[in-house]
Amino acid sequence: MGAKDDNKALVRRFYAEIDAGNLEAMDELVARDFVDHDPPPIPGLAPGLNGLKQAFEIFWRSTPGTHEVLDQVAENDLVATRIRARGRFAEDLGDIPATRGPLDVTATAVYRVKEGQLIEHWGETDSFTLMQQLGVIPAPAGPA
């Protein structure tokens, strides 16, 4: 495999380890000085790798599920990945009470890879759909 394929495989493994709840794998896959340009809106997260671990612990408890890699493109040290995240809103997420309902959202993430580790992240999530599924925004009414 070439560097681009290795980088894409690294990102796929990252999501597989998230799905498995393997927090220890983050030490291998993510640089200590990891920079998240779009961190989750959770107050009090530490910077870097430690903040990423904190966020995953919170989301694993509240919204267990899986990530499906739909598409990937790699160029130089960047990997763009489109994912579909499916799960269940199982436990309260901060002040948002759990609905116990299904979650199904898409996101696009771009990672920069350096020396076999994720070093930077930029992302866009379908936040509107996510907020509807979390019960924060009312879902649209069905046909009349």
Question: In which residue ranges do the predicted regions lie?
Answer:
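C-terminal and inter-domain tail/linker signature
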Residues: 1-144
